[in-house]
Amino acid sequence: MSSSRYILIPPEDLHPLTSNTGNEQNIYPDFDPWAHTEIEDKILLSFVAKGHYTSAKVNFESISARSSLQESLPKVAGMLAEQFSKVVHLREQTINKVSGESEESIRGKAKFTDLAGPGFSLPNRVTLTDQRRTQWLQELSSPNVSLSKLAKSIPHGFKRKQILEQCYMRQLPLQRAIWLIKSSYSIEWKSLTSKLKPGQTNEGVVSQLYNLWTNSMVSIMERLLFEMPKYYNDTAQAKIWKPRVSYYINLLGNCYNMGLMDRGVFNHWLVEFVEKVENFEFLPLSLHLLNIFWSGICPPTHGIEAPDNSFLISKITVVLLHKHHMILQNKSMINDENYIINDLQRNARLKESLLLRLKAFILDIFHHQSLEAFIMPNQNWDLYKNCLYEIVTMDKTSNEQAMVIKRKLELITYRNDSLQFNLLKQYKMKSSSLYESDGVEIDNLCDMQSILNVPFLDPEMTKILDNATPGYDWTLFVQQRFTCIEKVAQMIMWATNPSRKARYDGAHLVAKLLLLKTTSQENLPDYNMEDMIWKLVFHFSKLSERELSNIVELPSLYELLNIFIGYGIIKVPTYIRKLISSGIMYISDSKDKFFHCELLINLKISPLMKNQYNMMLKNIMEYDATYYVRYNYEQLQIQLNTAKEQMLQEQFEHISCLPISVKIWVSEWYLSYVCSPVDNVLKPVDKGTVIKNFTIFGLYLKEIFHFYKWVEFIVYHQLLADINALSALIDVLLYYENLFPLLINDQILFMKTLIHIYSKGLKNKDNLSYNITEFNPFWKFFMKHFPYLVEIDSDLQLQLGEVYESEKIRIEKLTKSSVDVITLYCNINQVNEESFKFGTHNFPGIFQQNLKILLKTESADACERARKGLSLLMLANLGDYTKFMSIFLKRKDYTIEQLVKLISVKLLTLDQIQKIIGDDILREILSRNNYGEGLWYELHKRNFIKKNFKIVLSMYRNSTSLDDRKLFLDLLVFYGPNSRLQEQVTTIICNCLRESNEDYSLILSLLRYGTKNIDQGTQETINIAKLYENLNFTNLWIFQAFTNYYTEALFNGATSDGQTITNFVFELIDLTRYNVLCSHLFDRVANFDVLEKLLEVFEADFFKKCLSEDPDDVHFLAVMIETIMNLSRKMNQSSAVISMNNESFRLLQATMLKFTSMNKTALCNSEMKLSIYLKIFIVHQKFIFQKVCDSLRQDRYDAEADLVKSLRLLFENTGFKLKLRLLLYDILSSLKSFVIYECTKKSESKRETRKLQISEALQNLPPFHISSFLDDMSISAHGDFDFLGLTEQPTPAEPEEGSQFFLYNKRTREYECGLNIEPFQLLPNHQSREPGSSCHFFNDTALSLSLFDARFDKKNPT
């Protein structure tokens, strides 16, 4: 082809000298005409006429110019210094100042001020009447009226919101609406600029106008959106509303694109609006808005640079993931009265549509935005991780992109995990092999600790179970914690442990969790769960009697298994088949068969299994015939019939001795009996019946499940006779508060029915008791623990509010109105109001009279009237009531039983007893149990102990009574695992150990609580370290308290056993067999110096292990790093910077040098050590960063300065493990930010300090992209692009028919010739070689074309 290199292109803004005639070529001058001024003419004439001469600096040109230069250089330097000073001042005052507005908004804010050319004038503001203004708007909305006629004036007082409202209400044509907005903008701007005050600028006025207009546009848009529910059932109004919204969105889009609003403010509003929308009815329109303005919020980056609004992108990412998660979890999208909730097809379509739109947004961010958008806090990542994986993996992509997507997901996951910095993943313990094999085939006896060391042990799960509250979200717990089948064993052993036997809700809670797991989407197979339960039972049978009693409370195990049977989780036939196939029942020297026989006797057996049950008992008759003789199926039926007859005769004492299977049959029969009508009429239930049935079901039979079934029956059938019966029932519900959500199937329906009974039925039936009885604690209990249920049902919320407020007003009225009090008192005692006077002067007489009747009279009616009278006195005048009750208590004319009775009927509190009488009486009262008046006494006692836990325990701590000592242990064991009281428990245990002079019998008593072998041991027989062999997840809180005491004693040298902290901590790790719980032993250590010493011991040992050549012990290292992490979290609560001593810092530097000297193979083998090292580095990173900065500031090239280079070198050499590389990237990026901050920070010292130099290794840190975390050496060595998701393209051969590209001549508008180029556009750029050359040449076709204003065009040349 002919070269066009020297062809000149005609200039654009210059006219030719000759006109273009025919085919002649235009001729252009090579200079522009001179446009000069009068002054320039004078200067030119004077220089031309007189000439110009510049005299020499020296007299003779031959003389050296050195003197002249020496003179001028200092002047030049001074001038240069002045200029540099001005530059620095300008930089600090102008350039480096952070503007309050975004650059985008500043760039686009002056468009409307460019009005027009000469002769243009803005419309005038004219005052019009309402009628004329309406007429003007009608003409403006009509396209038949010329705009030039209307453009001369605009109505006065017609601004912003009014203009926008009229635009969408009258549906102005968009061009005219934009003209009106622009004109109003300009008029306001012109008015404001004419009134500028000193110091104000035009930019400030423009910014103010943009904010005002944007806020107006946003508020109207928000108002229109929230008006939507008003028109659901009004078709006529909905037809008006829809066009208005559509028009206004269109108008907003035009204003957005034309720069008539602050885009930054609008984008932030839109993201926040989508975030705060919770009702699904607003979501479709919100997502539609987001779709319209999506390019402004998330502009495409093409992977080059992150946009300026990265914060907004991160925020909208979290919002979209949250919406996606909420829609997936929600069952119904429809909230419309015209549709039923069970409209499954319509609901599924809505759900699918919303999810598709959300997925599209999230995928767009994932593919086209920076990965930083998916870096989020711990709680968000845990919640949305599965959503992100589901969205991305369901996206249909080509094979080439699949690996890139996988790499991105790994990068996001590891980055979040490294920032989250959780503990290491839990690993299987050495004893987990017991759970991996079939339990029924194990011939050896399992040891106790092997069973307790369950695989995948989760201490956090035990903590949550111990702190269970009524309203806890157990569905979320199952999703996040119940992740593998091995967790079943941990939950069962938690519920059946002797230390948890006082937990009334343990068995029912575990059963509910297993049910939730079986019904969840990611459920465990039923047979796997049942097999795991029976395996654990067979493991229990292998234990000796002593070991079994240490870890299992057998009645609790029987109760739990029967609940499982009731819910269908396990089946007795399966258990019997396993017993038969195992052959255990036929082995003569096996003691397992007796355990299984006792278990079978206590399991509920159906009549169909009668023969198999009897057969199993017959098989051991030669070893022990009593099992079959006493407990065969027929004998159990006889015990059932006997129990029925005794219960009908009100004889309940012998029921407690029955096997649990018989108790279940008796409970089912009694439930049917009390729910059956008499003469076709259901008998009303009074207070006595409630207490009696609770005593039978809850105390004698231990079947609280059937009691709750009876409670549901009497509530739904509205059988409560009076307020007293309701009060007794509510006391039971409050005492067993954790069972409320577990055993009440429909809490909303139950509460609605209960409120209806209270406010409609009993209010009229028992109005007297209604006015003096408070139920607000129960209403508050429900609203506090079940807010989600209250939000779901607006009717329930309204009813709860009504009863709560009405009761509150009623009680306040009694305190202010003596007339109402007199009326109520007269009605209680059935006396005439005229003959009775109630006042301050006769309050003592009334109080003493009623109190005497209550305590001394045997008549139930008289006691009830006295109780109501005292309750009325307490409500009417609490101050006087408390005063006279104090006088009564000080006289000490009462018995303990009488005080307990006063507490049981809610007329006395334990706080009053503690304050007035003292601890002696209080201690005796707390040791009593009383159920005669219901459960209020037990409920009040429990609440008092929780509130005054430390005081109560101190009363029993030093008591010599065996009963007091037992109660002290009971309280410690029951409340010890509770996180809210654990600090107080730890303090009490430590004080007891200090006072006992190294007598550790208290620890042994706590460890052996509930067992039969209470061998306390002596001082000489107790080995401190060997105590930790008993460590398991159920008694961790005991060892935490003991570790707190003992480590502090070792630190202070207060022990006499010759131990040191170093020996102690490593000995207990060995003795616990690297138990994962060992890392939590120091969670209760409060002394900061002790924590610092412990951290120093662990880190020094780890560094020495890294420097040695010993093989790695994976289990030991796992326990060590978890311990270090826990200690660092504890220290971070007290100090922001965790320092290191000189020896530890020296070891850290030496370990870094060893890692940097390793090759990649050695580093790969030391991966776990390097990971732990980096986490220790992060623990001390503030301290280390300060050391590095001090070294860089002083220009010392010592170990601290080399640390930066070593980190960067490790970053380059750890391509084999992405997580390690991300940890190093976190450290390097944090160090870079820290150094930059130190550079800009002003020195506190006035003297000049050396400027901090940023290391080149930090300056060249790559951005957070995929390419920054790929192993370049492996790429260049292997040439393999598969891991990027890219396939190598073969170089296409040159087409035979001609070239694929042609040169196009702009002048002649013809294709001149073909152009042969190399396929540089392919990703694997295979360069061709020059003829006779063995090296590659650079394909610069695109660069060459650009030099001639040429480009590639995708148009078809034909």
From Swiss-Prot:
Where would you find this protein in the cell? Nucleus
Q: What top-level branch of life does the organism fall under?
A: Eukaryota
Q: Where's it mainly located?
A: nucleus
The record, for InterPro entries, names: Mediator_Med12
Q: What does this protein do?
A: Component of the SRB8-11 complex. The SRB8-11 complex is a regulatory module of the Mediator complex which is itself involved in regulation of basal and activated RNA polymerase II-dependent transcription. The SRB8-11 complex may be involved in the transcriptional repression of a subset of genes regulated by Mediator. It may inhibit the association of the Mediator complex with RNA polymerase II to form the holoenzyme complex.
Describe its assembly.
Answer: Component of the SRB8-11 complex, which itself associates with the Mediator complex.
Q: Family, per the entry? A: Belongs to the Mediator complex subunit 12 family.
* Protein name per Swiss-Prot or TrEMBL: Mediator of RNA polymerase II transcription subunit 12
- The source organism is Eremothecium gossypii (strain ATCC 10895 / CBS 109.51 / FGSC 9923 / NRRL Y-1056) (Yeast)
What taxonomic lineage is listed for the species of origin?
Eukaryota, Fungi, Dikarya, Ascomycota, Saccharomycotina
